[in-house]
Amino acid sequence: MPLTVRLVSWNVHKCTGGLDRRYDPMRTVDVLTAANPDVVLLQEVAQNGRWYRHDRQVDLIGDALSMPHRSYFVNVRFGPRRGEYGNAILSRVPITSSSNIDLTLANRKARSVLHAELRLPTARGGTRTLHLFNLHLGLGEAERREQLRRLLTSPALQAIQLRTPTVVAGDFNDVWGTLGKRILVPAGFVGPARPLRTFPAWAPVRALDSLYSRGDVEVLELVRPRSRSARTASDHLPLIADLRLLSPHA
């Protein structure tokens, strides 16, 4: 029986609406609950700020989704009022290891990729490995290119065999929709057949967010929800991907 996984990638904008600027983590939870994911890759997840009621959003969202396995790394620190934020991976299945890959360039905002290794139970009582890389790239075009090159040459990615199921997803800030094709595809990754516009959420014109896969995994479907809650909960729309892990002997 094929092993399938539903994954959501989303820049949640610190659970703050892109239009109304209202902090409402339950809107974020509602959108994610409707997607019914097995694993979630989130960017701009905040904590420790008065503006966010001192919520630790990774735990607030994880508890609401009944996802006990979590990895979180702070990228940007502001102070007592605005707190800090970073990338998070939440999962229904165990995260066996995780690490953060620093992609920050000189004189630029801190950026990174959160890497997690998951073990997915199979019908026959075994497990399959799935590697996830949750990224949030910079605003400059040259900056983004260099950050992706650093990811490709990082020890974490270099150690993964080409056939091992691997997904790179997140907020690429890819204004022109060419970044992954130019850098990830030549490295063996497969991207979406067509870019899905995700920004701004209420009237999307840019495909800033994306998902690429490599190895014994295929993307069965990649969609962006357009519900009212999805268009108001953040300034980005989420991406929902249905993945199927292929037989390692295929």
Spans of model-derived segments:
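Active-site regions of metal-assisted phosphoester/phosphodiester hydrolases
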Residues: 1-39, 53, 63-64, 69-250
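A short beta-strand-loop structural module common to alpha/beta enzyme folds
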Residues: 41-46
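Membrane-embedded segments
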Residues: 48-58
